[in-house]
Amino acid sequence: HPIYKDLLSHIEKESKINLSGYNDILAGHAVDASISKVAGGTITITNKGKSEIMMPLLITYEDGTTERENVNPSQQDLILEKYRNIKSAILDPDQTSLDINPENNRYPRPGIGIRIFTGFDSPSKKDIYLSPLIGYNSYDGIMLGLSMYNSTFPAKNLKWNITPFYGFDSDQLVGQSWISYDTKFKSDKIRKIQYRLGIKSFSIANNEDANIQLRYIRIDPCITLHHYHNPASKLYSKTSLRQLWTGTDISYLEIDRFTQNITRLTHNRYNFDKLQPNELEVELEYNQYHAGSFLDSQDYLKLSLDYRHGFLFGKHRKLDIRLFAAKFLMNSQRQSSSYNNLLAQGSIALLNQGFTDYSYNDYYFDRQGQSKRAYRQIGYHGGGFKDALGSANGRIGQSNDFAMAINLKTHLPFGQAKLPLKLFFDAGYARTKSFSADPLKGEVFYSGGVMIEIGDGLFAFHLPLIVSQKISDIYKSESRNLLSKITFSMDLHRLNPWELADDYIF
């Protein structure tokens, strides 16, 4: 069967024009040619990308005349001698080459332009985008913020984002920022290497007696190797090494700050097949944490696996299966009956809420699990259960040794297929204990019900109807009615526009 390479070969043969650069583009390699230097009548063009493509060059001389010619920047610098002083030059003036960074296609370099929200990057300005934001959590209250960033589409190699918020309840400046740089490769093994540094800090509690606001900070440098796959395969994979440092203010036990040093080696593999999409995450995590002089330092080494597979069984109808397992290969607190607190961190949680998110990876309205409404927010990491029991019942479904789970969700096989109503069922096993003197023993949990899901996991509401005994006992002890069992979730990481535009383009 003919493929795109056959078409390009035929056009090359008939036109006598080298089109190998377009073959590189179709193979997923970026175009980034740059006017790197202009001195008198000499112009230097550098190919910063991994595709060699013919593109027009428009030169304006100081005497007012213009000249237009086609150039083909290779992997070496292309130096053109014009013997007349050059006033300005534009590479690819008609924007037909799919160059990912049109800002460096001009001499002189463009000035700064301010744009609101998003759009295609302007070739005549160095765009800075502004987006006003509003947020909320239980301790900062309503937050007003402004997100500033330098790249939308096509994504630049150097990207940054600064998003400060002001919390009206905390009277604090909070928020997050990051900067990243991509090194692209023309290789059948490596697509790019991304270097990234992020920082995030929000309030986590308040000490009303001392009238101080407690907050956390997370700093996470990361290097990610993006493997190359033929775009026609619908596969994508990456391997990342991340070092996280977290510091959490504490107002009791004479401890000022609880710190963690977490190292994560993670491999992700995605298959964007329409009929059977699936993804795999394998992660090895080492954590050394310390709660001041009051407690000894502790550490662990944890291996986890997360596999998700979807089965399309009708138009707009899908069954999703998720398998999760995690095991502590080493844990100095394996025999502890404390979970995700000062005494024992990194515990495997079948039921995830704000107080189990020990590395501050996600966004929660309430991280203490005590707010009457906000604590009903759950996360899909770990065991992926849809129940919210609060921090007072935080020992349920947690383990410092081993846990595994299966999560099922499906559209209804009848009725309107486009309705977001689904059924779910979660089952899990955890080796756990209630008291430190007890031996570790396996416990089984399950929960099933109905859910409303928007955006394939972006936002969801869940109503558990059938639950295992321990979960049922908590519901009964708190006299929960049907409405008070409803939980909600949101996965804001799925809204990352830079990953959507540059990586997950299937």
What are these model-predicted stretches?
Residues R317-N331, L343-L350, G455-F506:
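Predominantly the C-terminal beta-signal and adjacent terminal strand-loop region
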Residues D63-Q76, L80-K192, P221-H229, Y252-Q276, ...:
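Outer-membrane beta-barrel initiation region
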